[in-house]
Amino acid sequence: MASVFSTDLITFSLTATDKVDAISQMAQLVVAAGRGSDAEQITKDVLARDEMGTPQVDGVAIPHARTSGVSQSSVAVARSTNKNVIFDEDEGAAEVLFMILV
């Protein structure tokens, strides 16, 4: 079984200004790493799952979804340069994101 982690799935320069943009940029990272074929589908599925809530605490958010957009389970990691990506209004902005895709 291949690892769900890869250095190709890590970025320290996420420029997103909101959660939709953050998820989209991370989905594009997954596709660029060869772990998926459809960034749009990944984004759609993660946003649909986000409607039920995304875990977030102390500046770390964990958007996740089951999606047909990936060819193998993957975890993408990103650090936001804007530090203003909000998944949970009560928790404030997230600076670090772990996007789990299966």
PLM features: what roles do these ranges have?
Residues 1-102:
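Cytosolic covalent-transfer regions centered on His/Cys nucleophiles
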